From Swiss-Prot:
This is RNA-directed RNA polymerase. The lineage of its organism: Viruses, Riboviria, Orthornavirae, Duplornaviricota, Resentoviricetes. InterPro entries: DNA/RNA_pol_sf, RNA-dir_pol_4-hel_dom, RNA-dir_pol_luteovirus, RNA-dir_pol_reovirus, Rotavirus_VP1_C. GO terms for cellular component: virion component. It comes from Rotavirus A (strain RVA/Human/Japan/YO/1977/G3P1A[8]). Keywords: Magnesium, Nucleotide-binding, Nucleotidyltransferase, RNA-binding, RNA-directed RNA polymerase, Transferase, Viral RNA replication, Virion. The keyword Transcription regulation does not apply.
């Protein structure tokens, strides 16, 4: 057992260091004799500790338990009330506390004033501007740091340098906090007015960020960056991140490309040894200098100095430092503004009549034409999705807020809820459901707002529109997206591509006679000037489409969509400002519609096309690619002569002038070698990602539990690490220890062991080895997995009561009746289960399930209930396979060049040996014929789990299933009788297994699993034709080899002689694999 359990026991003796503290380890074993000893051992431990005796003699007596059984958890018992943090903190509070400069930020409340100066009373107070929104406390964070420092105070050599750097930074944090006292959190991990009133308002969120930064310090450069950001972010809560990260958009244009990867015709990355010189006009350097001067004005010293030193020779080797600075800048935390300021921000731009109306007209027409192009085919063919758009919308209705709280009756139960799905049910039950009427959002019914906070940017507002808007838009937007899926211009949606493909797209056409124009249009998307041309373009497109069909249902769908656009042209929003709710006319486009992403992409594409058509009046060039990715767009232009400084300058000036003619306040740049957009940046022909995920501050509070957040924390740590920002792993493990502990009483806590948290059960939180997903196959591992499966699904009385009410039942049967032609229990049950699952977002249901889960967990962590589960997990399959594999050492040379410099060494090594992949492996089953058949006739989308279940049924049952979903009998029987059906069986099983093995997450998504280099390390003699078995054997072998390579930087070869008799058994088993959902899998999903 790894490091975790060691850290756990050390951490417990660090935190509970008084005389009264006792730690009782609890063991379990799958061996029944040993299990009896485990139980005796536990009973005696509890008895001894009650009598105040030392447990040492027991550890001797039960050595067999400690050596051969598995640690399940540690029971910790302590009378100590928590002033421990303060006591320990004093030892570090040796420095000068920071003093906040109260004039740095434009908005008064963004200055780090004492809370009582910002909020006169508890009634006025809100923590929403500084809430860390994470279920762990500042005192825990401080404890985790001090624990690390104490553990490493005797380190030598380089390790000692790291210790000194971190200690030095922690002294700043400790001294500042100590001056005011450690703020105590309440039971919801929030900081109340009476705790904060005599302390600086941003103390907690600043300290969390500071701790996250100092625990990510390794080198001297890290130390300098961290120190500067920690000190300055104490005062500057508004613009620091923006200042520090601004130069990157220019830096990417300064490095020559000497060898790069390009996307070839097969959509694979292929090395190209081309050399492209960075052509940089003087004005660009002036702009960069201005940015650096602004940094200096804000008090930064070391960071601008590092940038200036790098500018001397602009080398790619030292560029990693630039990318480090860029990543670090996000870790100062989220900028959280008041809603009123976030909303007024968009309304500040004043109208000018001095705009180029021709350009606006062209822009609108391009939007119109694109909308028509996207929807033309489905409309002309009277696509069933557009006919049954309302049903499709209801089936995928989310359980997010509908903007207002209503009193709802479900049977005898009356509840208050804001959730869309509940409102829909209630409206249907009371005859208030009128999807054909889109409610206005004018001055009489202003839109309530949500918020989106990001580091380094202003807070943005989000419309919370009534559910009618979702229903009206859903089907049409789905069709728009499926068009975008096979259109390369839409980088974000393009079929199964990933960021690497988009990278190769850009580098492909860079040469001495081309330049790339890249623009950040986030300001334009939310500007008032965009609104009318944007909505009108969409409306005109819909009008043209309406004339292309005679189907009244399709016309109705298009008209409803049109109505949403008309309503939103006259939109008002409601903003709480102190006690009053202000109504403000809001003339801009905001997120919150179903169409937001798709429509913005269309608009941004239209925008760059408009600009390029103007540029084309003056220059002659070929547009090699145009791409739009979220808020950014970019294009590569190829001229017929080599590019000169003067050309770059002129094109740049012209582009900026053209944008200004449309009053678009955007950041447009021209370069010959690289681009920088929100999602990724390309410099020196290599691709970089910003490692800017905050660990100890969250954007908002959801309804995830401490366990979920521990998994999310780990998952964020992994993503950052892949992108080049590494936080100390021991610190992360310490946070997991804290966040997964369960309080039994005030003085009793239970801490789960590594085995519990890393086995893939419903409780999995992290991997014992970074980047490697292990599937336990030992007796003890399978035993504990089975034990956890027995208590995975928890009941909720409230949910059951709602689900048994007439309102709920009627809704579910309404959906089933509209969807199904004939009875189909799988689908009806599926709908009921889905609708019931949506109730989880209603807090009381969630809490109830959670409590049941915790109490079951507590029982389990004290003594696992052995239980024979008939469920088969992926572990069982791998366990059956494992014994038949023989390992030998092998050798695989490095043969690919690096293209992602920020990757950790071990991951980089594996990619350099076997290559990378530029596609997502299909793990949803959507590529199978049955899935396509269903979507041809029905709006129902079965999940991969359901397809997996259905495809293994008898042929007659599959046929009935298809017919009930509206597939004509002839098609259904043809399908079942054809070879396609047996191919599907294999395809779906494949997708399902990929899905279970999280092949598209973590670092596995970077590896080429079909690499011939990998294949040649595997030898499996061909026996019998069971492709599914061959598939799983190969996949297992690949994972084993890759995991071994990540761990040891060495290759192994696997030989498997799988007996024919076992193959059939295995094949049968493979059709009964249960999927396990855990905090770990949902954290992976959350990353997506």
């Amino acid at each position: 057992m790894g490091k975790y359990n060691l850290i756990l026991s050390e951490y417990l003796s660090f935190v509970y260091n008084s005389q009264s503290a006792v730690q009782i380890p609890i063991y379990y074993s799958s061996n029944s004799e040993l299990e009896k000893r485990c139980i005796d051992f536990h009973v005696k431990c509890v008895d001894y500790s009650k009598r105040g005796l030392s447990l040492k003699s027991l550890f001797e007596e039960y050595k067999d338990v400690i050596d051969d059984a598995t640690l399940l958890s540690i029971l910790s018992y302590s009378y100590d009330k928590y002033n421990a943090v303060e006591r320990k903190l004093i030892n570090y509070a040796k420095g000068k506390p920071l003093e906040a400069d109260l004039t740095v930020n434009e908005l008064d409340y963004e200055n780090n004033k004492i809370t009582s100066e910002l909020f006169q009373s508890a009634e006025e107070y809100t923590d929403s501007l500084m809430d860390p929104a994470i279920l762990t406390s500042l005192s825990s964070n401080l404890n985790a740091v001090m624990f690390w420092l104490e553990r490493h105070s005797n380190d030598v050599a380089d390790a000692n340098k790291i210790y000194k750097r971190r200690l030095d930074l922690f002294i700043i944090v400790a001294s500042t906090i100590n001056k005011y006292g450690v703020p105590r959190h309440n039971e919801k991990y929030r900081y109340d007015y009476d705790v904060m009133k005599d302390k600086p308002y941003y103390l907690v969120t600043w300290a969390n960020s500071a701790i996250e930064m100092l625990m990510s310090v390794f080198s001297h450069e890290d130390y300098l960056i961290a120190k500067e950001l920690i000190v300055l972010s104490y005062s500057n809560r508004s613009t620091l991140a923006k200042l520090v990260s601004s130069p990157m958009s220019i830096l990417v244009a300064l490095i020559d490309i000497n060898g790069t990867f390009i996307t070839n015709e097969e959509l694979e990355l292929e090395f190209s040894d081309k050399y492209v010189k960075a052509i940089v006009p003087d004005q660009t350097f002036n702009e960069l200098q201005e940015m650096i001067d602004n940094m200096k004005k804000a008090g930064l010293v070391d960071i601008p100095r590092m940038i200036q030193e790098w500018l001397i020779d602009c080398s790619l080797e030292k560029f990693t430092l630039m990318s480090k600075i860029y990543s670090w800048s996000f870790h100062v935390g989220f900028r959280k503004q008041k809603m009123i300021d976030a909303a007024l921000d968009q309304l500040k731009t004043e109208y000018t009549d001095d705009v180029d109306n021709e350009m606006y007209y062209e822009y609108t027409m391009l939007i119109r034409d694109e909308i028509v192009k996207m929807l033309e085919i489905p409309v002309k063919h009277d696509d069933h999705l557009l006919q049954d758009s309302e049903l499709a919308g209801l089936l995928s209705m989310s359980s997010a807020s509908n903007g207002e709280s209503r009193q709802l009756k479900f049977g005898r139960k009356t509840i208050f809820s804001t959730k869309k799905n509940m409102h829909v049910m209630d409206d249907i039950a009371h005859g208030r459901y009128t999807p054909g009427v889109i409610p206005p959002v004018n001055v009489d019914r202003p839109i309530p707002l949500g918020r989106r906070d990001v580091p380094g940017r202003r807070t943005r507002i989000i419309f919370i529109l009534p559910y009618e808007y979702f229903i009206a838009q859903h089907a049409v937007v789905e069709k728009m997206l499926s068009y975008a899926k096979h259109t390369r211009e839409y980088a974000e949606f393009y079929s199964q591509s990933n960021q690497l493909l988009s990278y190769g797209d850009v580098t492909r056409f860079l040469s001495s006679n081309s330049m790339v124009l890249y623009t950040d249009v986030s300001q334009w998307d939310s500007s008032q000037h965009n609104t009318q041309p944007f909505r009108k373009g969409i409306i005109m497109g819909l009008d043209m489409l309406t004339n292309m069909t005679n189907d009244p249902k399709v016309v109705h769908t298009l008209n409803l969509y049109k109505q949403t656009q008309i309503n939103l042209m006259d939109s008002y929003v409601q903003i709480p400002d102190g006690d009053v709710i202000k109504k403000i006319q809001y003339g801009a486009v905001a997120s919150g519609e179903k169409q937001t992403k798709a429509a913005n992409s269309i608009a941004n594409l239209a925008l760059i096309k408009t600009v390029l058509s103007r540029i084309a009046n003056k220059y002659s060039f070929i547009t090699k690619i145009i791409r739009v990715d979220g808020d950014d767009n970019y294009a590569v232009l190829q001229f017929n002569t080599d590019v000169t400084k003067q050309m770059v300058q002129e094109v740049s000036d012209d582009v900026r002038y053209i944008y200004s003619r449309m009053n678009a306040k955007v950041k447009a740049l021209v370069s010959t070698v690289g681009i920088e957009i929100a999602k990724r940046y390309i410099a020196g022909g290599k691709i970089f990602f910003r490692a800017g995920i905050n660990l100890l501050n969250n954007e908002k509070r959801g309804q995830s539990t401490q366990w979920d957040q521990a998994a999310i924390l780990y998952s964020n740590y992994i993503v950052n690490k892949l992108r080049g920002f590494e936080t100390d792993r021991e610190f992360i493990l310490t946070k997991i220890i804290q966040m997964t502990s369960v309080a039994i009483t005030g003085s009793l806590r239970l801490f789960p062991s590594e085995r519990v948290l890393t086995t893939n059960s419903t409780f999995k939180v992290f991997d014992s080895e970074d980047f490697i997903i292990e599937y336990g196959t030992t007796d003890d591992e399978v035993y504990i997995q089975r034990a956890f499966m027995s208590l995975s699904s928890q009941k909720s009385g409230i949910a059951d009561e709602i689900a048994s009410s007439q309102t709920f039942k009627n809704y579910v049967s309404k959906l089933s009746d509209q969807l199904l032609v004939s009875k189909n229990t799988i689908v009806s049950k599926g709908i009921a289960v889905t609708e019931k699952a949506k109730l989880n977002s209603y807090a009381p249901v969630y809490l109830e399930k959670r409590r049941a889960q915790i109490s079951a967990l507590l029982t389990m962590l004290q003594k696992p209930v052995s239980f024979k589960s008939n469920k088969i997990t992926i572990n069982d399959i791998l366990r059956d396979i494992k014994p038949f594999f023989v390992t030998t050492e092998a050798n695989l040379p490095i043969q690919y060049r690096k293209f992602m410099p920020t990757l950790p060494d071990n991951v980089q090594y594996v990619i350099q040996c076997i290559g990378s992949r530029t596609y997502q492996i299909e793990d949803s089953g959507s590529k199978s014929s049955i899935s396509k058949l269903i979507s041809k006739y029905s709006v129902y989308k079965p999940s991969i789990e359901e397809l997996y279940k259905v495809i293994s049924l008898r042929e007659r049952e599959i046929q009935l299933y298809l017919v009930s979903l509206g597939v004509p009998l002839i098609d259904a029987s043809t399908y079942v009788g054809s070879r396609i059906y047996s191919q599907d069986k294999y395809k779906i099983l494949e997708s399902y297994v990929y899905n279970l093995l999280s092949i598209n997450y973590g670092c596995y998504q970077l590896f080429d699993f079909n690499s011939p280099d990998l294949e040649k390390l595997i030898r499996i003699p061909f026996k019998g034709k069971i492709p599914a078995v061959t598939f799983i054997l190969h996949l297992y072998a690949k994972l084993e080899i890759i995991n071994h390579a990540i761990k040891n930087r060495a290759w192994i070869s696997l030989f498997c002689n799988y007996p024919k008799s076992e193959m059939i058994k295995l094949w049968k088993k493979m059709w009964n694999i249960t999927a396990l959902r855990s905090p770990y899998t949902s954290a992976n999903f959350f990353q997506d």
